[in-house]
Every structure is written in structure tokens, then in C-alpha cells.
């Protein structure tokens, strides 16, 4: 009976150690995935910022061109 108890305790101990190692690896994998997600979101944010900046520049030039065309039309109508 004593040998059976020792064997059972050994099996339980090894199982707990194995479970602990698996949990640690799982935690590390989750941390790596979170870090990758953070990096991707930063890249997306930078891309959107660049796109919006360029779009704003294009809109500004288009607005200036439209105002210039309107001013030309008004000045031609006044002549």
C-alpha cells in the first residue's frame, strides 16, 4: 500500500509539473501574439495617418484650384 501511495504521489507531482510548464508556454505564446497585434495596429495607425495626411493635401490643392477657377469665372463675368 505504501508503494502505491508513493507511485500515486509521483504521478500527481509529475502531472502538476507538466501542467505548470504547459501553462507557462501558453502564457508566453499569448504574450507574443499580443505583441504582434500591437505592432500590427501601430503599423495600421501609421498607414492611416499617412493616407489621411496625403488626402488632406490633395483636398487642399483641389480646394485652391476650385477657388481659383471660381475667381477666374467671376473676373471674366465682370469684364
From Swiss-Prot:
Residues 23-45, 78-79 form a propeptide. GO terms for biological process: defense response to bacterium; innate immune response. Expressed by the skin glands. Its main location: secreted. It is found in: Secreted. Residues 1-22 form the signal peptide. Potent antimicrobial peptide with activity against bacteria, fungi and protozoa. Probably acts by disturbing membrane functions with its amphipathic structure. This is Dermaseptin-S8.
Amino acid at each position: 500500500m505504501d508503494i502505491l501511495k508513493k507511485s500515486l504521489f509521483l504521478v500527481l507531482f509529475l502531472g502538476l509539473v507538466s501542467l505548470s510548464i504547459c501553462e507557462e508556454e501558453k502564457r508566453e505564446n499569448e504574450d507574443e501574439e499580443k505583441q504582434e497585434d500591437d505592432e500590427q495596429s501601430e503599423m495600421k495607425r501609421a498607414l492611416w495617418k499617412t493616407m489621411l495626411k496625403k488626402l488632406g493635401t490633395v483636398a487642399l490643392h483641389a480646394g485652391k484650384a476650385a477657388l481659383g477657377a471660381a475667381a477666374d469665372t467671376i473676373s471674366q463675368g465682370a469684364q
